[in-house]
Every structure is written in C-alpha cells, then in structure tokens.
Amino acid sequence: MAGSFITVECPDCENEQSLFEKAASEVSCAVCGHTIARPTGGKADIEGEVTAVVEAR
C-alpha cells in the first residue's frame, strides 16, 4: 500500500478521527466540522496532532 492510516486529534474539540494520510478530498471533524486535512496532491496537509499511525501490512 502506498500510504498509511493515521489518527488525528482535532485542534478545536480534541476528537480523535482516523483518516488516510494521502487524503484526496477535504476531511472535516465528525463532531465540530473543523477541517483537519486538506489534499495537496501527495500527503495531505494535516491540521491537528497525529496521535497514531497504522503501519501498512
């Protein structure tokens, strides 16, 4: 696999959410709606703290 899944903590509400590190679309927090990832053509621009990385198998 060309990327990993990560767990990101929202900077506004501290909700933890899992997403693909190379997200192709904007990812918003499921609780407060704050944008936590923006696509850049490669790895996404992450807003918030990455708390865990799930390694590829």
Swiss-Prot record:
Keywords (A to Z) from UniProt: Metal-binding, Ribonucleoprotein, Ribosomal protein, Zinc, Zinc-finger
Cofactor dependence: Zn(2+)
Molecular function as annotated in GO: structural constituent of ribosome; zinc ion binding
One Pfam family hit: Ribosomal_S27e
Cofactor note: Binds 1 zinc ion per subunit.
Gene3D superfamilies, A to Z: Zn-binding ribosomal proteins (2.20.25.100)
Domain of life: Archaea
Residue numbers binding Zn(2+): 10, 13, 29, 32
Gene Ontology biological process terms, A to Z: translation
Zn finger limits (C4-type): 10-32
Gene Ontology annotations for the cellular component aspect, listed alphabetically: ribonucleoprotein complex; ribosome
Record-linked InterPro entries: Ribosomal_eS27, Ribosomal_eS27_Zn-bd_dom_sf, Ribosomal_zn-bd
Keyword set includes rRNA-binding: no
Family the entry assigns: Belongs to the eukaryotic ribosomal protein eS27 family.
Subunit structure: Part of the 30S ribosomal subunit.
Name of this protein: Small ribosomal subunit protein eS27
